[in-house]
């Protein structure tokens, strides 16, 4: 899901940044009194992939089920809507013609189509996961995945016997690089000498490439495999090879119960339920530049721990989670990159704009294609 293509979900925001600029684009600002539905709420969702993909889309579907219980109504949905206007617009309009007045998207590539739809249907509220467009009746949202990946890194550092960790990454974009760096910083909190060897697959969801990358990292000595790709394949390979891993998107113990130490998971219901209630109540004011969600507000969280994480280490990780929930910043200074260049000064925190365009790595991270 990227401007470079057609990139898959959850990862396109980074590519919209100009140096120092905002990462969301906007439509005209919301009216002072906000957006209010004209009829009773009827909600529909457009899924990028199948609801049982084991990752990104399934996390949204699981959130849908929880949201239905919270708001007391069913949510319609359609699966496998590709990032193409010729598919997105008809899918959304089909629901709108049936009375839907709240439409939720789940892909970066829906951004422009949702902008057009929001302008065409001013009485419909639009939300889009990992989108980049916003307006008076449109809000994009994404989570700060580096927070949960930092905690997964702590689990990896605690479980590793060698201090050599591997990481299967999709593409070398800021939104992926910030998870790699956070994973490394978390691991180094438990073991200051921990290293993270990274292989990029060049794809968001390619189990064949993910299997090859995970196997190569293990062959190179990694005894824990982290990931920022859509499928559970790296965890499956870790279990097959007798090492450990940390998952992404969902709790991947389902696929590798012996190997998976913990997972960085989406908890979309924690954000979407209150956001939908605001829309339903009336006077909704979408965030001007979209919602960049912290863990405490329902972005991501962790699921685990596996038995390889000692209880005392699990307690430390839980304490760090509590600190993050209270406002601890992962990218607080002083912080230098692997070449010794200062990236965050003492007393400062890395800006959101710099997060989205992150192209540097902390000490101990080794990247390869």
Give, region by region, the residue ranges found by the protein language model.
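Bacterial N-terminal signal peptides that target proteins for export
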Residues: 1-15
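C-terminal segment of classical bacterial N-terminal signal peptides
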Residues: 15-29
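Short linear motifs in intrinsically disordered/low-complexity regions
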Residues: 11, 21-22, 34, 40
């Amino acid at each position: 899901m990227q401007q470079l293509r057609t990139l898959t979900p959850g990862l396109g925001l980074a590519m919209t940044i100009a140096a120092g600029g905002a990462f969301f684009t906007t439509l005209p600002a919301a009216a002072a009194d906000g957006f209010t539905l004209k009829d009773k709420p009827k909600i529909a969702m457009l899924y990028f992939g199948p609801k049982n993909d084991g990752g990104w889309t399934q996390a949204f579907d699981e959130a849908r089920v929880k949201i239905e219980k919270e708001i007391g109504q069913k949510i319609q949905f359609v699966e496998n809507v590709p990032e193409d206007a010729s598919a997105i617009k008809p899918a959304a309009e089909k629901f709108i013609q049936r009375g839907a007045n709240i439409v939720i998207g789940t892909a970066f590539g829906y951004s422009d189509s949702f902008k057009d739809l929001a302008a065409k249907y001013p009485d419909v509220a639009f939300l889009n996961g990992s989108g980049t467009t916003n307006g008076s009746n449109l809000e994009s949202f994404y989570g700060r995945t580096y927070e949960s990946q930092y905690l997964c890194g702590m689990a990896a550092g605690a479980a590793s016997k060698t201090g050599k960790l591997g990481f299967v990454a999709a593409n070398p974009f800021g939104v992926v690089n910030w998870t790699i760096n956070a994973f490394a910083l978390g691991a180094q909190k438990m073991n200051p000498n921990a290293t993270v060897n990274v292989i990029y697959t060049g794809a968001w969801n390619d189990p064949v490439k993910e299997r090859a990358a995970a196997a190569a990292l293990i062959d190179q000595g990694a005894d824990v495999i982290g990931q920022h790709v859509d499928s559970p394949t790296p965890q499956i390979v870790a279990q097959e090879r007798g090492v450990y891993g940390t998952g992404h998107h969902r709790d991947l113990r389902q696929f590798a119960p012996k190997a998976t130490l913990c997972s960085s998971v989406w908890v979309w219901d924690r954000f979407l339920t209150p956001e939908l209630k605001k829309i339903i109540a009336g006077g909704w004011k979408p965030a001007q530049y979209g919602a960049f969600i912290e863990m405490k507000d329902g972005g991501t969280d962790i699921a685990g721990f596996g038995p390889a994480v000692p209880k005392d280490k699990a307690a430390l990780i839980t304490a760090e989670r509590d600190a993050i929930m209270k406002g601890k910043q992962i990218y607080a200074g002083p912080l230098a990159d692997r070449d010794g260049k200062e990236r965050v000064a003492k007393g400062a925190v890395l800006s959101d704009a710099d997060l989205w365009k992150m192209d540097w790595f902390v000490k101990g991270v080794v990247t390869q294609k």
